[in-house]
Amino acid sequence: MNYSVIVPAHNEAGFLPGLLDSLCSQDCLPNEVVLVNDNSTDKTEEIMQDYAKKHLFVRYVNRISSEEHQPGTKVVRAFQHGLKALKEPYTVLVKLDADLLLPPNYFSTLLTMFQQEKVGIAGGFCVEQNAAGQWEVNHPMHKGHVRGAFKAYHSNCFKAIGGLRPSMG
């Protein structure tokens, strides 16, 4: 099953290398990764350039956007910018936040979910480091909810819901 990944990023230089290292070390690599530099003022673009040079399946695009904080809007518009830049067909489309670390089998495990006919959206659990430095599962929503930090859409579902729409919340 082929999949493509879009990573919107605004001033994520401190986190982006961790995500990209874990993404490029998957046991099931994506067809294509599009990194969207969303008007960053730090070294985000330089990091994207570096990974795009090292990995043929990684590309980056720039987007000029407002400096204003726009909850639920800015990241979706950056994602849509990345969506327009995709060149390869995909069965599964993935949106990742830039501050994640993924285990090496994340996508091989995730893609098995889409072998079930009725699965249209899937994701995973966040494991975060607490104040004591210990890792713990952080999933404040019910089991049927997929966190926005890592959402994967079957292409048929993504088309049926009309893609992502910018909105608060």
Predicted region positions:
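N-proximal low-complexity "stem/linker" segments adjacent to membrane-targeting elements
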Residues: 1-25
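Acidic donor-binding loop at a coil-to-helix junction in glycosyltransferase catalytic cores
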Residues: 167-169
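Acidic donor-binding segment of Leloir-type glycosyltransferases
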Residues: 21-67
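Conserved nucleotide-sugar donor-binding
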Residues: 147-162
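Short alpha-helix within the catalytic core of nucleotide-sugar-dependent glycosyltransferases
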Residues: 20-21, 45-46, 104-115, 158
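Conserved donor NDP-sugar-binding/catalytic core segment of glycosyltransferases
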Residues: 101-136
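Short beta-strand-to-loop acidic/aromatic patch adjacent to the donor-nucleotide binding site
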Residues: 89-101
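Active-site nucleotide-sugar/metal-binding loop of Leloir-type enzymes
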Residues: 76-92
